[in-house]
């Protein structure tokens, strides 16, 4: 959100007065917990994930403006975020806007997009309102997944026509690319190899002038006009016994619609909008927003990329894991496989000030059965686990975060080239912070921290501080990095601070807490950071000592002294890199009066264990630790009738240092 601090403050003030957001997880206070939504500073929706050839996942989103126009969707551009670990997301900013299509498109209608990679180029398909008042799908092309994207056609790829929205593209193994779209009907075109055209002369296999259509509107089936909800027969789906063969076929493909509107059938099928088409292990999937309003995510499967489809069921329900609504009456999903896991992206209205017209992207892990069907997944506030640790010993952009409290980001152009841009954190004020998850300091640890910053404070004077904390906002402090003034926000400077190498080892969540003059709106800007790893001792080459020639000594026994040989010099050995222990399982947890007793499942390789406990489920504050060699531990002096969160990790010893494994599952315990 642009000026999000002011927006959040006004939202919180209003919500307190109206009694809204009860129990919500709010960005603007200490209760902020969720990793879902994955972006916290702007409203994002309609996620379109892409696994790129560079090894990263890119997620393209539409962008809900902070202020709506006519109390409706206000959307003018598309954002992009990337990750290699699924928990820390790098913000690439706006990668395309409706202005690129202003020859034929109108503003305030940058709906759900999708980007695909082919032959070294990236093709972004976007739906926009056309100047004639209907909708159309355009395409923009780039040499980079983050743009700049340009319109090669100067006109729509398909349309304009009513309800031409929500494009989804898949390139099949045989090289044929398919474009699906539509609300509430579903359409398909076969894209040519250039990805910016389709064969308009195709008139077979259900295609007419290059487009195939699935009739899914109520007025597509005349018999539905005479069906009412008398006896609840629409709501329970039993009316499907009295429909035509054509309607029955549509319902077999996309489910029996059970929405009622003025006592009539609102939709003959469950399909509503937002198709996501892909192939996997010989199966083809159509995932879509269904059964609105509020919408959930359903799917159908086929053995062919062109159907016929078979309705399979629900992936995401209408409500969150806690039974409460998502805060958004729409939903829109994207599905990928990445590094041995499968994920579904979707959106909610869970950010402060959020709702149906101000949405936020989230992600969950999903699983498939042997027959290819998908298991229903919960929508959670916790999100997903990291698939790998983040390397802190290379440059990390400051806008790469898992969670940010009150931080903003901005574009910074290099010289006059508006296509050559960077991004940085801005509007940093006292008490703001960012969280970077699963930072892997390795067994050897960090000895220094460097940051690139700018400020309007006089050069050399203190502009603020970056406190580095482990595992919580108030966790163990690695260092207090003093941000020096650079004289101007346009002038950048870097410095280093030393770190105790014994502290920064293993894998941790890293919190960067920003401190400074509480009355100043912007302390400094922050571009990137990097740790320095402890240098391993060099292994010296043994240098033999010179061997003196033995001199015979005459003795009464007339014996000669032996020749002396040089002894080899001992080699200095670097600490051996050891394997971190496995995750710890809590085999028994018992709550007592003001205490919790834990029994940890023993790990043979472990030298001991570290137990972390807190009243904050994401361990962002008030975290306490117990290090022990025992696998049965009692945590005492706890507040009675208070809920605590407990987790444990094992460690092994390596050259006098503890090397920790990852934490096991967090357990929620209410003390008696």
Question: Where are the regions that the model predicts?
Answer:
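Sec-dependent signal peptide cleavage junction
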Residues: 20-35
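Carbohydrate-active catalytic/glycan-binding domains of CAZyme proteins
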Residues: 32-480, 484-538, 570
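Extracellular low-complexity, O-glycosylation-prone stalks/linkers
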Residues: 606-625
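Short, solvent-exposed loop/turn segments at the edges of extracellular beta-sandwich modules
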Residues: 517-520, 652-658
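Pro/Thr/Ser/Gly-rich low-complexity, intrinsically disordered linker/stalk tracts
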Residues: 570-605, 658-672
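Ser/Thr/Gly/Pro-rich low-complexity, disordered linker/stalk segments of secreted
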Residues: 537-579
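Beta-strand-rich modules
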Residues: 638-656
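Short, flexible loop/turn segments at beta-strand junctions in immunoglobulin-like
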Residues: 499-503, 602, 635-639
